[in-house]
């Protein structure tokens, strides 16, 4: 089992604070905010698959935005009343990493949700590297594209 110090060393200070203490990276600073390459996004802590580039859109909010996770079972939702707001926190199912929040102001044609996710909680696996990185089973997501 990885200790907190080992995890922090492996993923970095910002990713550690975001995933383990529900911190939020500053808007428009994350690596994946304005990034639209073909591939999947995984939990930086556990490597569990979370989102696809097929469901990513430019919301203008300053963080990566997705209309849905690859499968709903991959994330869990939790009420969040911090900072005097009522929001729904999104965590990864396996590791329980804080990812961000989900809002109901997403594209209507894609279900109406906007998963506003911290780049620091994610690792991007390019389509061309998915098989090599152990994510071959998810290649079929892109068969129609």
UniProtKB/Swiss-Prot annotation:
Query: A GO molecular function for this record?
Result: peptide-methionine (R)-S-oxide reductase activity
* Residue ranges of coiled coil: none
- Its EC top class is oxidoreductase
What Enzyme Commission number(s) appear in the record?
1.8.4.12
Residues of the active site: 116
Q: A Gene Ontology CC term for this entry?
A: cytoplasm
Record field: catalytic activity: L-methionyl-[protein] + [thioredoxin]-disulfide + H2O = L-methionyl-(R)-S-oxide-[protein] + [thioredoxin]-dithiol
Q: Does the keyword Oxidoreductase apply?
A: yes
Cite the Pfam families for this sequence: SelR
**InterPro entries for the chain:** Met_Sox_Rdtase_MsrB (IPR028427), Met_Sox_Rdtase_MsrB_dom (IPR002579), Mss4-like_sf (IPR011057)
UniProt domain MsrB: residue ranges: 4-127
Q: Does the keyword Oxidoreductase apply?
A: yes
Report any one BP term from Gene Ontology: protein repair
Q: What UniProt keywords apply to this chain's record, in alphabetical order?
A: Oxidoreductase
Q: Which family does it belong to?
A: Belongs to the MsrB Met sulfoxide reductase family.
From the Swiss-Prot or TrEMBL record, give the protein name.
Answer: Peptide methionine sulfoxide reductase MsrB
**What is the organism lineage in this UniProt record?**
Bacteria, Bacillati, Bacillota, Bacilli, Lactobacillales
User: Coding gene?
Assistant: msrB
């Amino acid at each position: 089992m990885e200790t907190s110090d080992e995890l922090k060393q492996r993923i970095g200070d910002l990713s550690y604070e975001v995933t383990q203490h529900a911190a939020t990276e500053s808007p428009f600073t994350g690596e994946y905010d304005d990034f639209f390459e073909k591939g999947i996004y995984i939990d930086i802590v556990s490597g569990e698959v979370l989102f696809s580039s097929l469901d990513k859109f430019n919301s203008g909010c300053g963080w990566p935005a997705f209309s849905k996770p690859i499968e709903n079972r991959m994330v869990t939702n939790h009420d969040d009343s911090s900072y005097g707001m009522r929001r729904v926190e999104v965590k990864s199912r396996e590791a329980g990493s804080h990812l961000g929040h989900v809002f109901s102001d997403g594209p209507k044609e894609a279900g109406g949700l906007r998963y506003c996710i911290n780049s620091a909680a994610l690792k991007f696996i390019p389509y061309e590297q998915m098989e090599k990185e152990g994510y071959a089973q998810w290649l079929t997501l892109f068969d129609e594209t």
